[in-house]
Amino acid sequence: MTIVAPLGREADDPLVIAGTALRSRLLIGTAGYPTQAIMAEAVRASGAEVATLSIRRVSLRGHGSDTVSLLSGFRFLPNTAGCETARDAVMTAELAREALGTNWIKVEVIGDRETLYPDVAETIEATRQLVDAGFVVLPYCNDDPVVCSRLADLGAAAVMPMGSLIGSGMGVANPANLELICRRSPVPVIVDAGIGTASDAVIAMELGAAAVLLNTAVAKADDPVRMARAMRHAVEAGRLAFGAGRIPRRARAEPSSPQLGLVGS
């Protein structure tokens, strides 16, 4: 009997973050679903191994939240959503470590409430402090190659540049910058925010991203479970296409069939 590995999830192509190997290159959020039951079904349908959640929805008394209980067996990536200063982000990360027993943290420090753009200076400072405190830091940032390089130099385990505005569904707004970030980064690049549908995830992966993190695209879809499956296959297909290498774009046609031996030639 031949066992065929799922597309893009071959054992020899794991996503490695801080020495942890993950089969899936899709990370998924847990907020905003119609019900907790649908959330749990969609997250499992996505094939993801890492689920993000806000520390504000986790009990610090040891009872856990519905999300934690429903997703037993997943690796959790708590985030610092809602924080506007490095100080608040560090405090939230410490609470997350106490509540969930993990030193993984997704750093979000927002600098503008209308666009939810990250505050670069505060994000860099939070990353510096949290790395020094022994956290595995995955910072959300803008799609700036210099910022991503600085975060990696500080010890971030991965960088998470935005595809476009959080929750916008606009896809990858600046593919040239994202490709440059992916090509230069010494740590995994996880495209975070703005993914609206499966084709957006494919594009992010084809540009060289190591992974995609998304939430709204699945949570707010008409059928979250079906969209989660679509995203799973999209990330896998995009990774395979990146590894295979696309043909160059040309301004004119080039026949794919051999011309030798044609009638009349």
UniProtKB/Swiss-Prot annotation:
It is an enzyme of class 2 (transferase). It catalyses: [ThiS sulfur-carrier protein]-C-terminal-Gly-aminoethanethioate + 2-iminoacetate + 1-deoxy-D-xylulose 5-phosphate = [ThiS sulfur-carrier protein]-C-terminal Gly-Gly + 2-[(2R,5Z)-2-carboxy-4-methylthiazol-5(2H)-ylidene]ethyl phosphate + 2 H2O + H(+). It is found in: Cytoplasm. Disulfide bonds: none annotated. One of its GO terms (cellular component) is cytoplasm. The active site is at 106 (schiff-base intermediate with dxp). SUPFAM superfamilies: ThiG-like. Keywords: Cytoplasm, Schiff base, Thiamine biosynthesis, Transferase. InterPro entries: Aldolase_TIM, Thiazole_synthase_ThiG, ThiG. Its main location: cytoplasm. One of its GO terms (molecular function) is thiazole synthase activity. Pathway: Cofactor biosynthesis; thiamine diphosphate biosynthesis. 1-deoxy-D-xylulose 5-phosphate binds at residues 167, 193-194, 215-216. Its EC number is 2.8.1.10. One of its GO terms (biological process) is thiamine diphosphate biosynthetic process. Homotetramer. Forms heterodimers with either ThiH or ThiS. HAMAP family: ThiG. Catalyzes the rearrangement of 1-deoxy-D-xylulose 5-phosphate (DXP) to produce the thiazole phosphate moiety of thiamine. Sulfur is provided by the thiocarboxylate moiety of the carrier protein ThiS. In vitro, sulfur can be provided by H(2)S. Belongs to the ThiG family. This is Thiazole synthase. It comes from Methylobacterium nodulans (strain LMG 21967 / CNCM I-2342 / ORS 2060). The gene is thiG.
